[in-house]
Regions:
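Active-site region of glycoside hydrolase catalytic domains
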Residues: 2-39, 63, 83, 92-194
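Acidic/histidine-rich helix-loop elements
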Residues: 37-47
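Short, flexible active-site loop motifs that bind/organize anionic cofactors or intermediates
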Residues: 45, 52, 81-84, 126
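Conserved phosphate-coordination/catalytic loops
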Residues: 49-53, 88, 130, 134
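Catalytic domains of carbohydrate-active enzymes, especially glycoside hydrolases
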Residues: 50, 54-75, 107
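Glycine-rich, proline-tolerant flexible connector loops at the mouths of alpha/beta enzymes
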Residues: 74-88
């Protein structure tokens, strides 16, 4: 086996996604949609990998593998569970992850949005609503003010091309039907006309 040489500054790391890893993301749009019937989700995320409480282990594993970067997402629904109200404990939590990365020699790479958003944001029209960009920018600004000076890189939106890419797969009609049924059930449960 030969050793590869990477350019100085090359980031070799691992990544996690808030909703998929942290668990108990109860204020998010996805959590809400997981708990309606019918649902496109086969199984609710629940505690997921319990990454919200076990994050130090994740960071330690990344450092222990000799990597130099750890990408994680900041869950908007935790940071801003209600419009304009920012949760100091959630910000403390994500700031601690940044600081632990730095202490372990890992470049912290922060993703501001990894598919999920606050439930209140979805109730107000989600990304299609006129003020959505301003709402998202406000959240990003709060997070960046808190620890942006210590992150290596920022990813605004995780895989923004994915919906378009999935549309090319020509999924069977029942998948689209279930997706529409999930959205209708979520709208009904939330008291929003679909």
């Amino acid at each position: 086996m030969t050793a590869a040489t990477f350019a100085p500054g090359f980031l070799w790391g691992v990544a996690s996604a808030g909703h998929q890893n942290e668990g108990d993301n109860t204020a998010s749009d996805t959590w809400f949609a997981e708990h309606v019937t019918p649902s496109v989700f086969q199984e609710p995320s629940g505690r997921a990998c319990d990454g919200f409480t076990r994050w130090r282990e994740d960071v330690g594993l990344a450092a222990g593998m000799g990597l130099n970067a750890y990408r994680f997402s900041v869950e908007w629904a935790r940071v801003e569970p209600t419009p304009g109200v920012y949760d100091a404990a959630a910000l403390d939590h994500y700031e601690a992850i940044v600081d632990e990365c730095l202490a372990r020699g890992l470049a912290p790479v922060v993703t501001y949005n990894h598919f999920t958003a606050p439930h209140w944001f979805a109730m107000r029209g989600s990304w299609l609503a006129a003020p959505s960009a301003d709402r998202f920018a406000s959240y990003c600004e709060v997070v960046t003010r808190r620890f942006g000076d210590r992150i290596s890189h920022a990813v605004t939106l995780n895989e923004p091309n994915l919906p378009r890419l999935l549309s090319w797969l020509h999924l069977p009609g029942f998948v689209r039907d279930l997706e529409r049924a999930t959205l209708a059930a979520a709208s009904e449960a939330a008291g929003v006309p679909s």
